UniProtKB/Swiss-Prot annotation:
Organism of derivation: Francisella philomiragia subsp. philomiragia (strain ATCC 25017 / CCUG 19701 / FSC 153 / O#319-036)
Domain of life, source organism: Bacteria
Enzyme Commission number, as recorded: 3.6.-.-
One GO CC annotation: cytosol
Cofactor note: Binds 1 potassium ion per subunit.
This protein's name: tRNA modification GTPase MnmE
Binding site for GTP: 224-229, 243-249, 268-271
Length: 450
């Protein structure tokens, strides 16, 4: 529920720094700031002044007043740029609270910007994405969403969809007309155009979601197959201990890297085998649990006979664990230690040949990983997307397919109903129709000062 009281929070990261910013927003923001500074503040002017708690000077700094509606939140906003010492910033916050403000909830400044139509929901989410971006590519894509690229795509779709709905519903409302609107080629062409556009947005959304969420890779295999060496090769540094002793990795080893700007969460697991060692057995249990969370499994093997590759299936190599691996997770067989072979086979299907120790084939493996999730570096128009966006687009796509079926069958009323459902799913992306629960969940994931 939107309350128009005045909120305050520190807008800069925790810890010491050269500058710390306290942000105030609400109807009393200006009067509180003028009490703190004992100055008359002009809109959009940087005023250098002392900051007081009644008559005691807390600090001095620059204060800027942004009057409504020309501010980030759409309300009166004041930003106090003081020295970046947490104790000083807390004193300023304390004085602000005494003058009638309250502490802001997580994401409340951006929530107010959304509720005051300064941002739509995809742009509001992009604020968090640009702050939390873990790669340059993710940051650039979040900036595209923030400037409205994603919203424009959805709004253009909605405009076409609403026009088509009007046309279809007109044919239902005026049955006395001799013209059969449903046989009009314009409807077929328009519906096909919407179908194709939703499919394009669906593909872009999935790539954008990868930039936000990243890809979780699990390294699985028998002991001493070279999983830890592969982790180090992918990470470009020594993250895991590598020895010739089987079972060296007894716990989960995690590494966060980027491949062509895509965040990768790589998890090296204990070698899968039956073991009487209590510690190793616990590591294997944790490995099995982590496998359930994977986007991809890299099954590392060095299964060679007489310098020839053995194309054994995962269920043959680790039969006692195979039934615990989810069937819907993609598995890539990474044949390690190819430097031991006289002749190296060509990569094919889900079989990639590498030498983690010699760094042979690592770039090919990286390309394979990205290709498996449908990510392409050639797409310069990717904007960041959330899992909820992907779900909404998937639902919209399912119902636009049903709409096409109803058009072919000549069922005007069912066609109109399917188009309405598509519209509702698209509206949920930009926040045209969103429940309070959904908004609360989205904005609670923000940092306090945003």
């Amino acid at each position: 529920m939107y309350t128009k009281d005045t909120i305050v929070a520190v807008a800069t990261p925790q810890g010491n720094g050269g500058i710390g910013i306290v942000r105030i927003s609400g109807s009393d923001a200006l009067s509180i700031a003028e009490k703190l500074t004992k100055k008359r503040l002009k809109p959009r002017y940087a005023t250098f002044c002392n900051i007081y708690n009644i008559n005691e000077i807390i600090d001095h700094g620059i204060v800027i007043f942004f009057n409504s509606p020309n501010s980030y939140t759409g309300e009166d906003v004041v930003e106090i740029q003081a020295h970046g010492n947490p104790f000083i910033l807390n004193l300023i916050i304390k004085a602000t609270l005494e003058y009638g403000a309250r502490m802001a909830n997580a994401g409340e400044f951006t929530e107010r910007a959304f509720l005051n139509n300064k941002l739509d929901l995809t742009q509001a989410e992009a604020v968090a994405d640009i702050i939390n971006a873990s790669s340059e590519t993710a940051a650039k894509s979040a900036a595209k969403s923030l400037q409205g690229d994603f919203s424009k795509e959805i709004n253009n779709l909605l405009e076409k969809l609403i026009y088509l709905r009007m046309y279809v519903e007109a044919s239902i409302d005026f049955p006395e007309e001799e013209i059969n609107f449903l046989e009009d080629q314009k409807i077929h062409n328009s519906l096909q155009d919407i179908y194709k556009t939703i499919l394009d947005v669906k593909n872009s959304c999935k790539q954008g979601a990868i930039l936000v969420e990243g890809i979780t890779l699990i390294l699985v295999g028998k002991p001493n197959a070279g999983k830890s060496s592969l982790l180090n090769a992918l990470a470009g540094k020594e993250s895991a201990i590598v020895t010739s002793i089987a079972g060296t990795t007894r716990d989960i080893v995690k590494e966060h890297i980027q491949i062509n700007g895509v965040p990768m969460h790589i998890i090296d697991t204990a070698g899968l085998r039956s073991s009487d060692d209590i510690i190793e057995s616990e590591g294997i249990k944790r490995a099995i649990k982590k496998i359930q969370e994977a986007d991809q499994i890299l099954f590392v093997t060095d299964d060679y006979t007489n310098s020839q590759v053995k194309f054994s299936d995962i269920k043959d190599i680790i039969p006692e664990f195979y039934h615990q691996i989810p069937k819907d997770i993609d598995i890539t067989y990474v044949h390690n230690k190819i430097d031991l072979l006289k002749e190296v086979p060509l990569n094919h299907d889900n079989h990639i040949y590498i030498s983690a120790e010699s760094n042979i084939g690592i770039d090919k493996l990286k390309d394979h990983i990205l290709a498996k999730v449908g990510y392409t570096t050639q797409n310069e128009s990717i904007y960041t997307a959330r899992e909820r966006h992907v779900t909404a687009i998937d639902n919209a796509f399912d119902h636009i397919k049903l709409a096409k079926e109803q058009l072919e069958l000549g069922n005007g009323e069912l066609l109109a109903e399917e188009l309405l459902i598509v519209q509702e799913h698209l509206n949920s992306i930009t926040g045209e129709f969103s429940s309070d629960d959904l908004l609360g969940e989205i904005f609670s994931s923000f940092c306090i000062g945003k």
